Amino acid sequence: MSDKRPRSPCSNNNDELNDSSVLTENMDTVATRSKNLPFHETYKSKPTPADKPYRVDGIDKYKELYEQSIRDPEGFWSQMARKELRWLRDFTKVRSSGTCLQDRLAWFLNGKLNVCDNCVDRWAEIQPNTTALIWEGDDPSSIRHISYIELFRNVCKMANVLKRFGIKKGDSVGIYMPMIPETIYTMLACARIGAVHMVVFAGFAAQNLLERLVNARCKIVVTADQGSRGKKIINLKDVVDKALEKIPEIKTCIVFRHLNGPIEFVKGRDFDGETLMRSEKPYCPLEDMDSEDPLFYLYTSGSTGTPKGVQHSTAGYLLYAAVTQKYLFNIHPGDIFGCAGDIGWITGHSYLVYAPLCNGITTLIFEGVPTYPNAGRYWEMVERHRITHFYAAPTAIRTLKRLGDDFVKKHDRSSLRVLGSVGEPINPSAWRWYHSVVGEERCSIVDTYWQTETGGIVIAPIPGCFDTKPGSATFPFFGIEPAILDPDTGKEIDGPGSGVLCIKNSWPGMFRGIFGAHYLHEIYTKPFPKYYFTGDGVLRDQDGYLWITGRIDDTINVSGHRLSSKEIEDALTNHFGIAEAAAVAIDHDVKGNALVCFVVLKDSGNRTFDLNNSSPHPFEYELRMCVRTQIGPVATPDHIIVVENIPKTRSGKVVRRLLRKIATGCNDYGDISTVANPECIKSIESSWAQYLKR
């Protein structure tokens, strides 16, 4: 299988991350977002039922536990690990001497455990009939309840299926599946036998799937015939077939018939998943896994442009996901956790699959979208399943807010105790609506900040501890020591101020590197050595509350999905008519960010490609389809503008901050002395104005 190595972070594609002037320029852009933040608007913490006491009762208890976790991380996390996880062999050392990615980072050394044992077996033993999974399909009438004992049997059968095809400890398994229980069976089956799963979001195109399957060195692919979202059918098997045409090394594809759509089986390669599972025994022995054995790879876009296979460990990841959920959402036995995130992203991995099951509660897996068959779908599910916790993206919250309160108020939401937001900073007006309308001013709002690389939430308010402020991520979780750094000097800023968000030291859930390209850890460490560089700006107010102000690298967040500017630009320049492209994000009321792409034509005199004078233009459709086909629908540009030139530094770097300012109507461009071709600015302004008049 060919090895498509991502480019070195020392190449020109990544020089911007190591250029403090670029970080400073980007900080200027995100700083404008903080001007109208409600620093002095607070909401009191909510009372909780007597049988659901707060895990941390008050700010004094939080300070005590937090200070312990920073002062004595070994003592704090060893106690948590022995309390929350079932070990097959106890660990002998809590963590290695390494405290960051440059070192050989390891937690719970010499310990043995199995993730599936912790998420399935131990609960099947003591509460076999408790519901583990509630699945609700795109069609509201399609509902399945799976108990812990049923989950155990199905996972064991799927594990035996994988073993039948020679999958063993350390092998990679590609998963390209809709939001159905079989997806979770497959993930847990991998964990049971020591295989490493690599889930790909089922909205990605064949090229994206191909790149990830190759990079992760997958031995087998598990998929379904089709998926359905908002009555829209996604032909998953067709995408897999197209990807596998170029990967002859993958000789097995397991296909689940979810919608019984028409599919063609490739003889000798494709096998029916249900038929295979029916023929297997409902028991499969556990594999003893070392604490540091990889559990999964999950690919995320970054500033290098090449998707990165983030690698997470077995013990540290599972512990951190479970503990953050238990404390930040005040989890208790009998709770029903409704995470609206997709399993193809880290939110689904951590807070739909691993944390709820490790905590022994019920988790919802929802195939559909929040607006189908109407905008009350989320709240209808809350009423139907008596969901106690709901965790959704600000994009969805903003969409539902815009569609009106009636869709919310017609459904009983009295079961809810905690409402969470995830994927991007939630704007204050959406926060207030979530609190007052959805939560009826009685639910705690947990605005969470974290990343694929962190494994779990790193900054968020713990219910019962603090007053909350709309739009603020509030305070760090246990073991997380945030640092606000000056982008020019790299020095820490104490007290109120804004800068680059970094994290000191390590924590159990921290990723262990980039699979197949461990040198890429420089992306996270080179800008500020000995710190974890998040790529986000942050502001700390007079009360110590933290406010995430947005990306300061060239990663774009659209509807909670992290996309790379470079990846989008490459897709556009793959079109025969495009010489250069630059992608930037501007604020969008619903999606958080809208994608604006500036393109330079290879034949600048060809009026056939004049997008700025007609609407819609066939060529514009072609370019959008280029991006959709190569990356996926989530990356579809909102605006495409033809320009004569793109502003660059003398070393050839695109000055995206200028393009952002033009697209947002800001005429204060600041210092442009580093721009090699400042004469192009007026021309771009004119092209943008012409485009807006279409």
UniProtKB/Swiss-Prot annotation:
Catalyzed reactions: acetate + ATP + CoA = acetyl-CoA + AMP + diphosphate
GO biological process terms on file: acetyl-CoA biosynthetic process from acetate
Gene: ACS
Positions with a binding annotation for CoA: R229, G230, K231, K232, T347, S559, R628
EC number(s) reported in the record: 6.2.1.1
Keywords: ATP-binding, Ligase, Nucleotide-binding
Enzyme class: ligase
Annotated segments matching region Disordered: 1-23
Family assignment from sequence similarity: Belongs to the ATP-dependent AMP-binding enzyme family.
Leader sequence residues: none
Protein name listed in UniProt: Acetyl-coenzyme A synthetase
